[in-house]
């Protein structure tokens, strides 16, 4: 990605069919929304929680725009899941919790095709008014687990910048070692005691049957 004045140019020899103009239009639309919201904040001198949620959620939408175009040029059939429409939540704008059963109903009504690859921005859901809400710390991992639960997925894979779960914090303990397997109960205990690789509310989504299988 290269910025030239106010224009954004996207080039990659590995993706010659990539539609620069369409992608640029999507990115510009997202950034324009942020700019309008920021102008409102400057005028009012404050930032309500619902506005903060909309601004902080834009990063996921920008990532989805890139991913959608990169997968499209590879010839994949794609569809977008809008979390504000399908993930039913309760709580505030910045730390909402997903109602799994209510969300399952909406996913069932939408109907997912087996021949289609679905993309969904993480970290967000919808209020009872359809407004954007955030799922809090580790919200992207949480929304991945929520999505897996709502569609009865056989597996939920979370790719991150760390190798996995260690027996203790490798930043503090030099000889910390990677755990090859970990039960969901153990993962939940680690998260409650401060391990940042997993969040308690993500672990809570797994059933007791799944907990016996563990992570590995």
What residue spans do the PLM features occupy?
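A short, hydrophobic C-terminal helix/tail in secreted or cell-surface proteins
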Residues: 3, 209-216
